[in-house]
UniProtKB/Swiss-Prot annotation:
The gene is syf2. Residues 55-94 form a coiled coil. Associated with the spliceosome. GO terms for biological process: mRNA processing; RNA splicing. Residues 18-27 have a biased composition (Polar residues). This is Pre-mRNA-splicing factor syf2. Its main location: nucleus. Residues 28-38 have a biased composition (Low complexity). Belongs to the SYF2 family. Involved in pre-mRNA splicing.
């Protein structure tokens, strides 16, 4: 029995030695994956850290935007409150009353200053002129003279003066087309330069100027180039509208002179017309609404 055990033990030893040798031979290979797992763990940890940093940065940006929106909302609320208060005060105040009070205050101040100046024995107009320069005083005098001429020019004098007033009014209403002027000017310069009438010269300062060599670029009394001008469609429409407006004014004045201003004929002769006018003077304020209702058909 002991001999068999010894044999079994001795027989088992070689197998253990073989297993150990096999483990030693195969154990070198598993050690390598453990070493390669360390960089993978490092890269995964770096990725996690970068993701956390990105999330933190995005959170900070969202917080900053939220704070900016809060500040804008607060400023908008404050401005709205101020504007609402100003609007309420403006609606509660009568502008006509304010203008009347300011006008009365200016008139009272003027009279008070005039009384004090005359009481001191000084010239009021001379003292008041000290507040203005010579240029301002001359401009004011010219303005007053112009206003006085306009007042005197209102009444009809003769047809020449009437035509002059119409012409000046049309000039005031006319607005120059600077864009079209610049286009035509540029086209004229290019045409003259192509024909050799203009010479482009550079000055010492580097500025480019055009020199008229033949003296034919600018218009003179003998120039007839304006006959080739073709107005645009808008200019033609404006001219037609002005002519129609003048014709309407002329016809309206002729109707007023003839007494044909009434659109509806409600009489059969001149005597009946006078009678209807007399009735209208006394009863129009009572019958206007009734007549309008009959014309609209709402009375029935």
């Amino acid at each position: 029995m002991p001999a068999e055990c010894v044999n079994e033990v001795s027989a088992a030893k070689p197998s253990d030695d073989n297993a150990a040798s096999n483990q030693t031979q195969s154990g070198a290979a598993p050690a390598e994956p453990a070493a390669s797992e360390e960089p993978q763990q490092k890269t995964s940890s770096e990725k996690l850290e970068s993701k956390e940093d990105d999330a933190a940065a995005k959170a900070r940006q969202r917080q900053e935007r939220f704070k900016a929106l809060q500040a804008r909302a607060k400023n908008a609320a404050e401005r709205n409150l101020k504007e609402t208060a100003a609007e309420t005060q403006r609606l509660a105040t009568d502008p006509a009353l304010l203008s009347s009070l300011s006008r009365k205050h200016a008139f009272a101040s003027h009279n008070l200053l005039k009384a004090d100046t005359e009481a001191a024995g000084e010239d009021f107009e001379r003292k008041r002129a000290w507040d203005w320069t010579i240029d301002e005083s001359e401009k004011w005098d010219r303005r007053m003279e112009k206003k006085q001429r306009h007042r005197d020019d209102v009444a009809f004098q003769d047809y020449t003066q009437d035509a002059r007033k119409v012409y000046k009014r049309q000039l005031r209403q006319m607005q120059p087309d600077m864009a079209a002027y610049e286009r035509e000017k540029l086209a004229a310069i290019e045409k003259a330069a192509a024909n050799g009438d203009l010479e482009i010269v550079e000055t010492n300062d580097g500025e480019m100027i055009a020199v008229d060599k033949n003296g034919t670029f600018y218009s003179t009394a003998d120039t007839i180039g304006f006959t080739e001008n073709k107005p645009d469609r808008a200019g033609v429409d404006k001219l037609v509208a002005d002519l129609r407006k003048a014709e309407e004014v002329r016809l309206k004045k002729r109707r007023e002179r003839r007494g044909d201003e009434e659109p509806d004929v409600t009489y059969i002769n001149e005597k009946n017309k006078q009678f209807n006018q007399k009735l209208a003077r006394f009863y129009n304020k009572y019958t206007t609404e009734i007549r309008d209702s009959f014309e609209r058909g709402t009375m029935i």
